[in-house]
Amino acid sequence: MQAFYKLIYNPRINLVLRSLIKRLLPILPKGLKIPIAGKFTIENKQGKTLIINTNQTSYVSRLLYWEGYLNFEYSDIFIELIKKVKVFYDVGSNIGYYSLLAEMENKNIKIIAFEPASGPLHYLKENVKLNNFKNIQIENIALSEKNGIIEFYEIKNQKYSYLKHNLAGEGNAGSKTKHRNFVPIKVKTKTFNDFVEEKSHGPIDLIKIDTEGTEHLILKNADVILSQMKPIVICETLFNTIEAELEAIFKKYDYEFYNHTENGLQKVNTIVRNQDDGVRNCFFIHPTKLNFIDNFIV
C-alpha cells in the first residue's frame, strides 16, 4: 500500500490526478477529492498569486484546494481585516496559510508566525521562501504559561509512514496525548508577555491563535498585551472545551464576543454553549477596535 501512496502522492502525479478530477467533478463522487501533495496556488481578486507547498497529511490544504480559499473558515473577513493591520501575530501558524495570506494582501504588515511542530515548521519556512516574502518572522517556539522547555507532542503518521513531515495540525503542548500516535519532542517556551517585551515589534493589532487546547494558558500570560494594546483576537472555540476559561480572560479586559457564522460576525453575550451550534471560531474585540470589523457584523 505504501508503494501506491508514494505513486499517487508524488507531486507531479498528484498534480495531474487532481487537475483531472477537478475538471470531472460534476460527474464524480465527492469522495474522489484526493489529498494534495506538492504545490498549488491561490489567486486573489486583484490577480495576486500565492504558492503553497504541502503534502497529503494537511487537511487545511485539501480544503483550500477543493473548496476554495474564500470558503475556508473566516478567510473572506480576514483578507479585508488584514489590510487595516500593522502588526499580526499568528500563533500556531501551521504551514503558514494566514501569515502568507496576510502578506499577500498587505505588503506593509509585520507578521510574527509561531510554529513549534517540526513538520508544519518545515513547510512554513518553505512557503515563505517560495513566495519571496520578507515581512514574516518565523519563531520556532511554543508560547506557554511559563518560560523554559516543555514536551511538545507531534503525531507520527502511520498511514504514510515513509513521510518525514506530518501536517495533521494536532501537535500540542500536552492538551492531547492519548488515543493518537503522539511522539514527544522538547521545545522552547516563552510567555506571551515576555516574548513581546523582549522583541518589541510595536502595538499588536491582530492575533490569530490556534494551539489545540492551550489557548487559555497562553492568553492568561498576555495580560499586558490585552490590557494595553487591546488587539483583536481570533481564537478557535470548540464546543465543551475551554470556552469558559477564554470567556473569563476576555471579560476581565472588557472584550466583546463575535462568533464567526456563515453570514458574518454575530455578537453574543457568552461563548459558553449548552449544545454544539457549529460555531468554531470567535473574534474577541475590544470596543475601541470595533471600527476594524464593523462591516462584518450581522
Question: Which residues does each predicted region cover?
Answer:
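Conserved SAM-binding strand-loop segment of SAM-dependent methyltransferases
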Residues: 133-140
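Short N-terminal helix/helix-N-cap motif within the alpha/beta-hydrolase-1
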Residues: 97-100, 122, 148, 216-220
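Conserved acidic residues
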Residues: 142-145, 191
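Short internal loop-to-helix segment that lines adenine-nucleotide cofactor pockets
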Residues: 66-87, 151, 166-229, 241-242
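Canonical radical SAM enzyme core domain
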Residues: 117-123, 144, 239-242
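Polar, low-complexity loop segments and adjacent catalytic/binding residues used for recognizing
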Residues: 148-158
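Conserved acidic-Pro-Pro-aromatic motif
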Residues: 39-40, 106-113, 191-298
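S-adenosyl-L-methionine
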Residues: 1-117, 122-127, 131-133, 177-181, ...
